[in-house]
Regions:
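N-terminal small-domain helix-loop-helix segment of the aminotransferase-like
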Residues: 1-50, 57
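Conserved donor sugar-nucleotide recognition element shared by glycan-biosynthetic enzymes
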Residues: 20, 51-52, 76, 101
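Short acidic capping loops at alpha-helix termini that bridge into adjacent secondary structure
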Residues: 39-45, 65-68, 115
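Short N-terminal helix/helix-N-cap motif within the alpha/beta-hydrolase-1
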Residues: 50-56, 73-74, 135, 161
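Conserved PLP-anchoring active-site segment centered on the Schiff-base-forming lysine
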Residues: 61-83
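A short helix-loop-beta submotif of the ANL/AMP-binding
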Residues: 85-90
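Active-site phosphate-binding strand-loop segment of PLP-dependent enzymes
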Residues: 91, 95-165
Length: 166
């Protein structure tokens, strides 16, 4: 039996990278339940092995070498390290306690963002624990549309010490 299985070409590969359909459908149902978002499990869901893989894929998809990425400070160091590895220039934007750990849009509006393609946010925020509001997300979307950049909210903590995840 072992010898026969060793000769079977189907036994020498990896599992499909997109995950099994049931997993993707489960993710879609979860997003609908908690966030009211309809996602197509065949085209809009990609299971990952962890956050670093997701951050890498997103940066590869939207940023070319020499372009810029807005990264929160303080924030997850992987945003900076992967952006630099991929040849992007990191532009930090400060999150300050006196501003509730939210972006200072006045400062951002006055920055030269002509080469910025991607802006990372992280709410609930690590390491501050600050939670975003629907108003913050509306403001981020408006900012991104006007500046022609992609906002990515890295959201691994929405169900930790948070009664109403958004």
């Amino acid at each position: 039996t072992l010898c026969n299985n060793a000769h079977d070409p189907n036994g020498h590969g990896y599992q499909p990278y997109v995950g099994i359909p049931e997993l993707r459908k489960g993710f879609a149902a979860w997003y609908q339940r908690w966030y009211g978002v309809d996602l197509n499990p065949n085209t809009e869901i990609q299971p990952l092995i962890g956050s670093k893989e997701g951050i890498l894929h997103v940066t590869l998809a939207f940023v070319n070498p020499g372009e810029q990425v807005l990264v929160p400070n303080p924030g997850y160091p992987t945003y900076t390290s992967l952006s630099k590895i991929l040849g992007a220039e990191v532009i930090n934007y400060d999150l300050k306690e006196e501003d509730g750990w939210m972006p200072d849009f006045e400062t951002l509006e006055n920055m030269d963002l002509g080469r910025v393609k991607l802006m990372w946010t992280n709410y609930p925020n690590m390491p501050t624990g600050a939670n975003a509001t629907p108003e913050l997300y509306e403001r981020l979307v408006d900012f991104a549309r006007r500046k022609n950049l992609v906002i990515v909210n890295d959201n691994p903590y929405s169900f930790i010490l948070n009664e109403k995840p958004i």
